[in-house]
Amino acid sequence: MNNSSKLCRKTSFPRSNIFCNLVDKIVKRPSLQFLGQWGYHCYEPRIYRTLAKILRYVDLDGFDILLTDYIAFVEKSGHRFELNFNLEFTEICVNTILYWVFARKGNPDFVELLLKKTKDYVQDRSCSLALIWRTFTPVYCPSPLSGITPLLYVAQTRQSNILKILLQYGILEREKNPINIVLTILLYPSRVRIMVDHELIDIQEDAKTCLMLCSRVLSTISVREIETQLSLGRRPIIQNWLDYIPPTRYKDPCELVHLCRITIRTQLLANNMLPNGIFSLLIPTRLQNFLNLES
């Protein structure tokens, strides 16, 4: 028996683990019996096909199981695989999962479940289980090295319903340069959108909603940076874009109530309590909804 297969069985799982089984299938192939022969071209197609078959038809319960298996697989990496294989295997798995969740399904429920399941890891960007910070390729290709993060992809496609969920979980507040997300929403060239009920969503209306959502998170939005980009010849998706950025984000004093929202959310974010921690606060429901970016 192959050493890697033996080591995989050393880790005890309460039931059959999707990813452990997938490794077993890979290492049983005669062409992969020697570690030196392992490489993307050898096993990537099998990983993608296996996970794609699951993700294409999976419901929320099934997706919950898949994420649980992946977390258990990574956390209990007593498998002791060759380092390069371990990194490449998990990289392909993450690329495939994010591709199907964000680029193929575009379902807010799946996005929220992914955030809930990996919430404990999001504060450490280097953690392999902080999936929301990993990159993927929107047009699928084996390597995500030239990919983008889910937040940037959602900004490019102006999926306002998914952006709202990401913002509620504090993903924009964790960005080093959040203005880049605003610039992407406003200036990224439009392209074919995900179809919902076989109807194409009005991209301009979604862009307006995305700008409004960002204004609920940020205290300032640099109009100067936007105008600089426009002076270089870039064209905004919304012609009257300034109408959708509150004056209190770029010229007038910021509202006190919004500053309070930012302060409370920042404290909750520091303790990894967004958004659930909002609803444990002993305040009226209307204020809870305000903190949760509903208005």
UniProtKB/Swiss-Prot annotation:
GO CC annotation, single: apical ectoplasmic specialization
Residue ranges of ANK repeats: 146-176
Keyword ATP-binding: no
GO biological process, one term: cell-cell junction disassembly
Sequence ranges assigned to domain SOCS box in this UniProt record: 243-295
Pathway note: Protein modification; protein ubiquitination
SMART domains: SOCS_box
Alphabetized InterPro entries for the sequence: Ankyrin_rpt-contain_sf, ASB17, SOCS_box, SOCS_box-like_dom_sf
Keywords assigned by UniProt, alphabetized: ANK repeat, Ubl conjugation pathway
SUPFAM superfamilies in the record: SOCS box-like
Tissue spec. comment: Specifically expressed in testis. Localizes to spermatogenic cells in testis, with highest expression in round spermatids and condensing spermatids and lower expression in pachytene spermatocytes.
Similarity comment text for this entry: Belongs to the ankyrin SOCS box (ASB) family.
Functional description taken from the UniProt entry: May be a substrate-recognition component of a SCF-like ECS (Elongin-Cullin-SOCS-box protein) E3 ubiquitin-protein ligase complex which mediates the ubiquitination and subsequent proteasomal degradation of target proteins.
Domain-related comment: The SOCS box domain mediates the interaction with the Elongin BC complex, an adapter module in different E3 ubiquitin-protein ligase complexes.
Protein name stated in the entry: Ankyrin repeat and SOCS box protein 17
Lineage of the organism: Eukaryota, Metazoa, Chordata, Craniata, Vertebrata
